[in-house]
Amino acid sequence: MAAKNIKYNEDARKKIHKGVKTLAEAVKVTLGPKGRHVVIDKSFGSPQVTKDGVTVAKEIELEDKHENMGAQMVKEVASKTADKAGDGTTTATVLAEAIYSEGLRNVTAGANPMDLKRGIDKAVKVVVDEIKKISKPVQHHKEIAQVATISANNDAEIGNLIAEAMEKVGKNGSITVEEAKGFETVLDVVEGMNFNRGYLSSYFTTNPETQECVLEESLVLIYDKKISGIKDFLPVLQQVAESGRPLLIIAEDIEGEALATLVVNRLRAGFRVCAVKAPGFGDRRKAMLEDIAILTGGQLISEELGMKLENTTLSMLGKAKKVIVSKEDTTIVEGLGNKEDIEARCENIKKQIEDSTSDYDKEKLQERLAKLSGGVAVIRVGAATEIEMKEKKDRVDDAQHATLAAVEEGILPGGGTALVRCIPTLEAFIPILTNEDEQIGARIVLKALSAPLKQIAANAGKEGAIICQQVLARSSNEGYDALRDAYTDMIEAGILDPTKVTRCALESAASVAGLLLTTEALIADIPEDKSSSAPAMPGAGMDY
């Protein structure tokens, strides 16, 4: 076991503080509309240019192991805020540094760290309650666009694209961000249930130019096993042929005699039919087939449920206004399922998302929810160079997450204004605390609430303390617009922050800063001296 280097008390706190400060200094320059970029060297390829706080934080690793512990803890603040709210990582880092730096001064002066932490926690609860009171729900397309624009560093094009995507797919829909091949940033929306399985034979196509099979007013047969023989399959085919409607068959696989029969009927009898493999694998496949059944108002024909293919009737088949099948994917538009059943299924999936601990499972469940409830929007980000594209893609990601957070919990006046508006409420609460050190802990939070606003002002080349005093002297929604160097009503000006982002940033910052304040010892490995570890080769340095 390697020997350890241990630091105690004042020495430990100084090391943590240096690490926290080093990371925070690199991250906080990106805050606000006039925040600067950070260029990150990469081991291969061109350097990365970013204004995203969590991206900067993740790249920082300090040489001194004790200082690095402090930096890693603040990195955790940024990561946790990104995980919970998807944005606000720079604000969280600024708050964490402000709470820890002020707390450290008081611990050094003799305050009890445990009481300070209790005071900090109580103050944060008061501020969070006040934030929820100030918050107002998102009601209009315009507000969504404003939130996205602010989060994308005042890029109105990105803001409008995200608002349009949200409007088209709804709050349960899925918005994904991809790299485009051209210069333009565009939005593609796939409405209805879409899955990446195409037709099993090109003979099913109805449009030779687009190589697609389009079925109008189609019936949908959903079966969870392979179909290879024609005997069991024939009764349902005859019923569909008599009805005169087209048929989409979704099964684990369709092969041999069954596939040949479908192709022959398509070519010779003009029977409008298309066969595709079921999406997904294992239990996820079964769940997706059930989703399709509910969406189309049909039944999943499953032998596990005592159903047999030969006994299938027309009433068991799903129905859809339109089905589009290409070589690679299938889209079911306007499934005619019962609306209440679809909503109940969506609620069930939401519950599974809440209960799931796996990020991968959550992502897959979210995809299923999106396909059932609204559709999928893809924002394809274009730019002149790869470096610019990556930087723009980061901003689109931030804006997308901020928008979802705003829809979930509402919006606040932005630019650090909302936290400053909580100062009078917290000031009134502090005298209620009976423990003196708890009062000091609450005052630490009180002072930290103005840190994001001061940093936004500093990045715009202004004196933060003066700007903060001016904002405090004004009415509720009025704040400092750093882009235009003016005081304005932040809600009317469209400078908005999602409530969830502000709340998560404060909670994460206070949690980690409180832990750091109550730290009394640091234990790290002593680095090995690599120069003396390898023995000299025999005969090295001799002349022959």
Swiss-Prot record:
Keyword Chaperone assigned: yes
Gene Ontology CC terms, in alphabetical order: cytoplasm
Primary enzyme class: isomerase
Sample GO molecular function, one term: unfolded protein binding
UniProt-listed Enzyme Commission number(s): 5.6.1.7
Catalysed reaction equations from the record: ATP + H2O + a folded polypeptide = ADP + phosphate + an unfolded polypeptide
Alphabetical keyword list: ATP-binding, Chaperone, Cytoplasm, Isomerase, Nucleotide-binding
GO-annotated biological processes: protein refolding
Subcellular location: Cytoplasm
CDD domains associated with the record: GroEL
Function: Together with its co-chaperonin GroES, plays an essential role in assisting protein folding. The GroEL-GroES system forms a nano-cage that allows encapsulation of the non-native substrate proteins and provides a physical environment optimized to promote and accelerate protein folding.
HAMAP family: CH60 (MF_00600)
Protein name in UniProt: Chaperonin GroEL
Organism per entry: Chlamydia felis (strain Fe/C-56)
Organism lineage: Bacteria, Pseudomonadati, Chlamydiota, Chlamydiia, Chlamydiales
Gene: groEL
